[in-house]
Amino acid sequence: LPICPSGSVNCQVSLGELFDRAVKLSHYIHFLSSEMFNEFDERYAQGRGFITKAVNGCHTASLTTPEDKEQAQQIHHEDLLNLVLGVLRSWNDPLLHLVTEVQRIKEAPDTILWKAVEIEEQNKRLLEGMEKIVGRVQPGDTGNEVYSRWSGLPSLQLADEDSRLFAFYNLLHCGRRDSHKIDNYLKLLKCRLIHDSNC
């Protein structure tokens, strides 16, 4: 849904509505990320021992994120908003390459391809929505430009199939993890900023 109908003048969507849309979108992205990871796991990762190798290998690890709800509640809302922006920006590049590289996986099902494209598009939409929210909550501030650079493209193009599939597995595992974090942070922010923490 477009935030404002085209051609509309002085269209003002409430902050509450912007948050509603962002939370729905982040929930949808997390749902798709989980589905895509599970599908990939079932189809390509069985018996390869990937899960034991995949601990703490996410490119967003350099962004300090709260581990649980209690920790997140200790963080000022401006810092939490900037953190959400940082994580979303950190995924722009990997998602773009994921869409291209996943097509080269042997017998990759259409459902995985479709989800990769959909997540990439929806992540961009969520980032735009979050920039609007930050502009509304912190006028004149589009958030700091801090994000984690991703250098994983060569590993998605390795000749060795096992190593390449592990790189995909790890990226999808991280996508599921980060989309879950964003979903939780947005719910917390919405509760704090829209409902005065009465949730």
From Swiss-Prot:
<feature type="disulfide bond">
    <location>
        <begin position="191"/>
        <end position="199"/>
    </location>
</feature>
<dbReference type="GO" id="GO:0046427">
    <property type="term" value="P:positive regulation of receptor signaling pathway via JAK-STAT"/>
</dbReference>
<feature type="disulfide bond">
    <location>
        <begin position="58"/>
        <end position="174"/>
    </location>
</feature>
<dbReference type="InterPro" id="IPR009079">
    <property type="entry name" value="4_helix_cytokine-like_core"/>
</dbReference>
<dbReference type="GO" id="GO:0031667">
    <property type="term" value="P:response to nutrient levels"/>
</dbReference>
<keyword id="KW-1015">Disulfide bond</keyword>
<feature type="disulfide bond">
    <location>
        <begin position="4"/>
        <end position="11"/>
    </location>
</feature>
<dbReference type="Pfam" id="PF00103">
    <property type="entry name" value="Hormone_1"/>
</dbReference>
<dbReference type="GO" id="GO:0005179">
    <property type="term" value="F:hormone activity"/>
</dbReference>
<dbReference type="GO" id="GO:0005615">
    <property type="term" value="C:extracellular space"/>
</dbReference>
<dbReference type="InterPro" id="IPR001400">
    <property type="entry name" value="Somatotropin/Prolactin"/>
</dbReference>
<keyword id="KW-0964">Secreted</keyword>
<keyword id="KW-0372">Hormone</keyword>
<comment type="similarity">
    <text>Belongs to the somatotropin/prolactin family.</text>
</comment>
<dbReference type="GO" id="GO:0008284">
    <property type="term" value="P:positive regulation of cell population proliferation"/>
</dbReference>
<dbReference type="InterPro" id="IPR018116">
    <property type="entry name" value="Somatotropin_CS"/>
</dbReference>
<protein>
    <recommendedName>
        <fullName>Prolactin-2</fullName>
    </recommendedName>
</protein>
